[in-house]
Amino acid sequence: MKTNGHFKDFAWKKCLLGTSVVALLVGCSPHIIETNEVALKLNYHPASEKVQALDEKILLLKPAFQYSDNIAKEYENKFKNQTTLKVEEILQNQGYKVINVDSSDKDDFSFAQKKEGYLAVAMIGEIVLRPDPKRTIQKKSEPGLLFSTGLDKMEGVLIPAGFVKVTILEPMSGESLDSFTMDLSELDIQEKFLKTTHSSHSGGLVSTMVKGTDNSNDAIKSALNKIFASIMQEMDKKLTQRNLESYQKDAKELKNKRNR
């Protein structure tokens, strides 16, 4: 009887230990490895040849861009800053002196800027990256003590949407002389991605042996690099000295009219 009591006590403790181990393991969240193999470079070199310098100044407003929620704030800031730098480089390559305006609003031009600026360039737009609904699938982890991974996955293709509109202004009057718009959904940019997140439940025993991979951030950076290059390529084609000098007559009339 005494031996039997010891056996029952041992079995009970073993059961408790096993239950505790299971509870501990079930409570562990699986590890997610986020890849970082792509750099956000946002590079572009003007394709057109440098032309003869003119004694004319162009006011360059800061871009007023909005971004989709999946684009990190630091990426937004770099995209905006690089846009300003590269458009400035394109305009300088076309022979213009560039005055950077620390605002995206034409109403913030100083009188001196209005007076000395031949033209002004303003940019607005929406930079959107979204999963292609036709080529994206979602798989949610089912709750369970044993085989639940505790990981939800979205796998598919990231595509661009939104637009960028560039407006050419006469600074003194603030009147628009011309504009052109780029539809980002027309760009042939497709980035495969796998986004992995923790499920609302902690997962089962198998979750302790599972490692999830998430390369969605790399896909976003790669897509932004390509979007940026496409936007700058279009800017390079449109913001030529030949095109910008074609506004000279209208710009002069508007400036003189405002000065009367």
From Swiss-Prot:
Region (N-acetyl-neuraminyl-alpha(2,3)-lactose binding motif): 134-139
Lipid moiety-binding residues (N-palmitoyl cysteine): C28
InterPro entries to which the protein is assigned, alphabetical: NeuraminylLac-bd_hemagglutn, NeuraminylLac-bd_hemagglutn_sf
Residues in the signal sequence: 1-27
Lipid-anchored residues (S-diacylglycerol cysteine): C28
GO annotation, cellular component aspect: cell outer membrane
Entry's localization field: Cell outer membrane
Main location: membrane
Residues in coiled coil: none
UniProt source species: Helicobacter pylori
Record's keyword annotation contains Lipoprotein: yes
Chain's gene name: hpaA
Keywords, sorted A to Z: Cell outer membrane, Lipoprotein, Membrane, Palmitate, Signal
PTM text: The N-terminus is blocked.
Full protein name: Neuraminyllactose-binding hemagglutinin
Transmembrane listed as a keyword: no
Membrane topology per record: Lipid-anchor
